[in-house]
Amino acid sequence: MDDKVEEPIDFIMKHCLWQSHSRNWDRERQNEEILKKTKQLLCGEPVDLSTPSDRCYWVDAVSLVDAYRERYTWINAMSKDELAQLIDTLKARLDYLTISGSLNEELSDKNY
């Protein structure tokens, strides 16, 4: 699954501004919520839209799913289990690239 993750990660890094928030907790929340909703949409599961935040994350997830289905047609042939594993692996990689492995010291500045 790791070999399939880099293309979708590259798309996020180049096209999705939500991965660029200036604080760790913002990035953690964005990654978690948007990718959770992305997984739900890809797997045909219900998505919670009860709060304004949920709807905001959902819009980003819909855009991501549409782009992935169009650009990476191999996603359309994956089972629900494979899709869930792909998104889980993608999230771990994105968290590393944008949070834990980032050299941006502002992410953890308590005064920022």
From Swiss-Prot:
Q: Give the matching InterPro entries.
A: Nase_Fe-Fe_dsu (IPR014278), V/Nase_d_su (IPR004349)
Gene that codes for this?
A: anfG
Task: Identify the domain of life.
Answer: Bacteria
Pfam families registered for this protein in UniProt: AnfG_VnfG
This chain's protein is named Nitrogenase iron-iron protein delta chain
Which NCBIfam families does this UniProt record tie to the protein? Answer: anfG_nitrog
Q: Name one GO molecular function term.
A: iron ion binding
Q: Which reaction does it catalyse?
A: N2 + 8 reduced [2Fe-2S]-[ferredoxin] + 16 ATP + 16 H2O = H2 + 8 oxidized [2Fe-2S]-[ferredoxin] + 2 NH4(+) + 16 ADP + 16 phosphate + 6 H(+)
| GO biological process: one example | nitrogen fixation
Q: Which cofactor does it need?
A: iron-sulfur cluster
Q: How does it assemble?
A: Hexamer of two alpha, two beta, and two delta chains.
Keywords from the UniProt entry: ATP-binding, Iron, Iron-sulfur, Metal-binding, Nitrogen fixation, Nucleotide-binding, Oxidoreductase
Write out the function statement from the record.
The key enzymatic reactions in nitrogen fixation are catalyzed by the nitrogenase complex, which has 2 components: the iron protein (component 2) and a component 1 which is either a molybdenum-iron protein, a vanadium-iron, or an iron-iron protein.
What EC numbers are recorded for this enzyme? 1.18.6.1
